[in-house]
Amino acid sequence: MGRFGAGVARIVLAGASLSLLAAAASAQDACGHRGELDTLYCDENKDLVADIPKDPKKFRDPSTLVWAYTPVEDPAVYANVFKPFTEHLEKCVGKKTVYYPVQSNSAEIEAMRSGRLHFAGFSTGPTGFAVNLAGAIPFAAKGLESEVRGYNLVAVVKASSPYKALADLKGKKVAHTAPSSNSGNLAPRVLFPEQGLKTDEDYKPLMSGGHDKSVLGVGSGDYDMAAVASDVFDRMATRGTIKRDDFRIIYKSPVFPTSSFAYAHDLKPELAAKLRECFYSFRFTPAMTKEFNGDDRFLPITYQKDWKVVREVAEKSGTPYNKAAYDTESRREADAAAKKAAEAAAKAAQQPAAPKQ
């Protein structure tokens, strides 16, 4: 299939038809209850996720399935890790299945909203936006036996630094990851003030673009502290990207649920059921188990129950999972990316030219 059929993925992504968007725009013309969902969707059973279309003609049953995984780190990291799983899905579901790397949370959400992604793994915070704005239905999370394992927000500093508590970081360079991230932005805004450090008052968060980039930035001295997900930090240490002893954790939050796996609400019900079956029956390869901190399978979840604490953090941080908040966060994400690119270009321009041979 070659890099998970990346060429096919580009064709499928680029070829999302206008008729699909028109169908989505006219969906759920008569909706008895919508809740927090976008106007494209309906939630008449009040389970907080989009109902399937009332008209069976609007069910989607694509010949090629396209999926993605949250870009909490460099998307290339997961290309080979997920290859055996993608191959399992092809055989189990009986459809060509393509893994497509996405570069940002907003790009992943937009791809599902427009019909270009059929299922995807979303990180904790963006799951709420994916549910409300893209019609995503979370159904699985990584875990071990009967336990879905979570992660913590951790505040990471250099081991040699003088910082012992969050309050020591007032006026310092603190990295957040992306505006829609739970542990990388929203949770610090809610939880850090309890420890004497207020975002935007005591420090101006610097958006790094990823949890791995934040950790590496602390190691290189670009940041004094970084708010990141513990599972990403642990994976970086396990694979040797960083040395754990070079860092200290000065704060650790209560547990949050980890990334969710969700399919589009308008997939044909039989296809959605088959995806659930194929996820739950898969056992991770040794490489996947190592990469995901010992997890060895996918377990059932629901957005209503398992994401309750995350929704509460979003509300308390002033970032509810609605279109207005999403547009604001997307602009911040784009601005941060543009600023970082400009800084990188300026830094490159200052480098002395290589001597001519």
What spans do the regions from the language model cover?
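Periplasmic-binding protein-like
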Residues: T70-P71, E145-V154, T241-F279, P286-V309
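Bilobed "Venus flytrap"/periplasmic-binding protein-like clamshell domains
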Residues: W67-E90, G125, E145-L216, Y223-M225, ...
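Short beta-strand-to-loop elements that line the ligand-binding cleft
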Residues: K96-Q103, E201-G210, R248-Y251
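Pocket-flanking alpha-helical
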Residues: Y100-G135, F233-T238
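N-terminal hydrophobic or amphipathic helices and topogenic motifs
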Residues: A25-A107, E291-Q357
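Bacterial N-terminal signal peptides that target proteins for export
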Residues: M1-L13
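Alpha-to-beta junction loops
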Residues: R113-F122, G135-I137, K172-V174, G219-V228
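Ligand-binding "clamshell"
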Residues: A130-K142, M236-I250
